[in-house]
């Protein structure tokens, strides 16, 4: 152990340097967000919990084309189409999404020709059981009704880039 090393050790040079760095950051504003009480703004392109949308007259948008089911890489979407109606259109009888399988890629939303299936703004949907992550048509429509205003605004903001 040399004299220089002994002097540095005795004067605690490294400790003093570390203390200066600590004090420098101590008085700066905190970059951390206090999460449950404060939330950062979400991008209009955010992909969260799925929702099925309705037209303003209350009719569901989904035309049972099954493009979302075909394009889903995780095979998380299951659709059963009902019989053709008098006007020649079809509607879904069953629309299920297995959120355990879903990878939130957004391909279902891009494939939909009528903007029926969208990924909404909600990212807080933790559950206690796996069964709660199997979304049926009623739950997806309820999500769409709950967030319709925000979803429509996000689609409008994203329209120039689509």
From Swiss-Prot:
Disulfide bonds: none annotated. Its cofactor is [4Fe-4S] cluster. It comes from the Bacteria. Pfam families: Fer4_7. It is an enzyme of class 7 (translocase). Binds 2 [4Fe-4S] clusters per subunit. [4Fe-4S] cluster 2 binds at residues 72, 102, 105, 108. Residues 52-82, 93-122 form the 4Fe-4S ferredoxin-type domain. NDH-1 shuttles electrons from NADH, via FMN and iron-sulfur (Fe-S) centers, to quinones in the respiratory chain. The immediate electron acceptor for the enzyme in this species is believed to be ubiquinone. Couples the redox reaction to proton translocation (for every two electrons transferred, four hydrogen ions are translocated across the cytoplasmic membrane), and thus conserves the redox energy in a proton gradient. This is NADH-quinone oxidoreductase subunit I. The gene is nuoI.
């Amino acid at each position: 152990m040399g004299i220089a090393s002994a002097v540095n050790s005795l004067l605690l040079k490294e400790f003093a340097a570390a203390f200066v760095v600590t004090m420098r950051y101590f008085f700066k504003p905190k970059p951390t967000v206090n999460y449950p009480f404060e939330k950062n703004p979400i991008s209009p392109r955010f992909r969260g919990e799925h929702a099925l949308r309705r037209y303003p007259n209350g009719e569901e948008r989904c035309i049972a084309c099954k493009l979302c089911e075909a394009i889903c890489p995780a095979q998380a979407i299951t659709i059963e189409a009902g019989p053709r109606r008098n006007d020649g259109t079809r509607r879904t009888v069953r629309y299920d999404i297995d959120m355990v399988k879903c990878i939130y890629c957004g391909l279902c939303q891009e494939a939909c020709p009528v903007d029926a299936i969208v990924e909404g703004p909600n990212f807080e949907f933790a559950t206690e059981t796996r069964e709660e992550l199997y979304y049926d048509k009623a739950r997806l429509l309820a999500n769409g009704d709950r967030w319709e205003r925000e979803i429509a605004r996000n689609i409008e903001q994203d329209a120039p880039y689509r």
